[in-house]
Amino acid sequence: MGGGSALSLAVCLVLAVLAPAVSGDGATLESVPDLVKAMYLNIESFPCVRLLNLSGEIGCSNPGSEKIIAPIVRLTKGSDQLVQPSTVLLPSDQMSDFFLRVSNDPEFHQKVSGVLIESNGANNNLQELSPDGKFPQDAFAPYSNRSHNWNPAGSGIMWNRYDFPVFLLSEESTRVLQKVSEKNKKTDNGYKANVAEFDLVMQTTKAQTHDSASCLKERSCLPLGGHSVWASLPPIKNGSTEHQKPIVLAITSQDSASFFRDRSIGSDSPISGLIALLTAVDALSHIHDLRNLKKQLVFAVFNGEAWGYLGSRKFLQELDKGADSVNGINSLMIDQVVEIGSVGKAVIEKYPSFYVHAAGNSSASNKILDALQSASKSLGSDNVKVKQAASSNPGVPPSSLMSFIRKNMSTSGVVLEDFDSHFSNRFYHSYLDNPAAAALVARSLYILASANSVVDLMTLNTIKVNVSLVEELIGCLLTCKPGLSCGLVKSFISPSSTSCPSHYVGVFLDDPSGTQFPSYADDTSRFVWNFLADKTSTLAGNKSSCTGKCGDEGEVCVGAEVEGGGRCVVSTTRYVPAYSTRVKFEDNAWHVLPANSSDPMGVVDPVWTESYWNTIGLRVYAVQDSTFDWLILLAGLSITAASYCAVHVGRAYISKVVKRD
């Protein structure tokens, strides 16, 4: 009894010593969860994860299967040194220089246990930041000159492998960690330090599968992919001969490459093209004589373009196969291709200027340029300029159009961009804050669909862009508030995430056979499908609500996810799987296919995959120096020994007194 009391007394004394150090703010600890909450601070952050291809790995991971724990040190200059293995807190403007140093300085690399990148917040003072290469995805270019610097600011750091965890902090977490690092600096060589604990253990690391072929075989990864969407305006009938018109195909991308999985640092520029296309479709949907045009308008939004042009290549493969996902169109019907690239930066100038990058110098491509210039003139006082890109360029810039050209070198197409020879957006963070691009695209498509017939100028001048829609799409797709919780998105779908929009393609989770009713499609793809289905539709005869399939052929259910159900409309809008043409889903698993010499883009396809993981976590807490721990232990043992002696002496004294009595 006496020994147990002594031990309890010792524990109480030790807790009394430690409690103030743990809580830090004098808060009352009433339970074990309170104690844990006071000791450990979970940090809101966005990870860089492990990606694999046929030749190896890129991205980030813990080096083994254990958590990483290291003190937090803030570096403000690229030349700063580390005296011990540390968690590096880094301003975002130092990111490129830091990772280049890590790759080139093995001694410095050994002292980097983990990296935390500060959020820039609203005060974006970055001069340039592009983790991509100087010629993104140059292996897919349909020309031999791969030395052209389309992206002069490109550092290429996102294509390297890092055997330490890297996280991007939220704005609030950035402020917290800056204070923590200051405390560490002030108590340098003291008995207490604040450390970061990283849980970024990748399944491919544990399974020792270090390329896409082996990890797919061992099922420690999944292929990158998602769903593209296409729609026709007006709707076309399956198997009918009346719609066999040449197709004017307007395309854009919905994804972008980023160093971090769930948050893009300055890589949203392709989304300006998506916003322009959606707004152009809305403008054209109000025209009533579209069935009388000589050509059929078709719109396609490709997913996975930043990772080997997954969406556009799979779309073309589906056309070749005559798959259900492209029922109603075929590749021979595609007459002209107009791609809307990054168009957000053009509006910075007083008079927006757009550059037309043509595939070759064919008469058909020149007709697209003529249509764009005619549309520009029709806008009158809006002063939108359309210029032909420099003839010194090696060809079209990195774009989905490359897939079409590599498939058919005689493809007539152009890419509309806000730059001439080099990306104008040095830190990849452009927003479309002017309806000029959407108006230009909408009118150009109308002119192209009119073919050689006389354009109805009265109708052309009625094609106007809804400025409020542009602003709403920016808020939904490019900002955190409201983000995908905006009213427009929620009128069509029930978003699975209320956090900031992510433009990372993700992994392909479905069995690809169920394309038109996928069990999983990301929020952006589902929104785009519903938006296009709505804007390109005519009302169905049956106006009852729906929650999935509609009864009549040619009908689709728009807004099926919203409360109260959706509505059936007549629309030709379909999902198309977007994943590598070099992988196949068979026997409930993914397999890498051998390269086919007839598919030049497939030959150079890296076949990107993403590792599985169990949990991803980042938390911060204070730890004592080991010397202090030994002192605490010694103090505890001393107290225990003293208590034992006191009890022993006390017992002897009491026994002696009792005997006297």
What is each model feature region?
Residues M1-D661:
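Secretory-pathway/membrane protein signature
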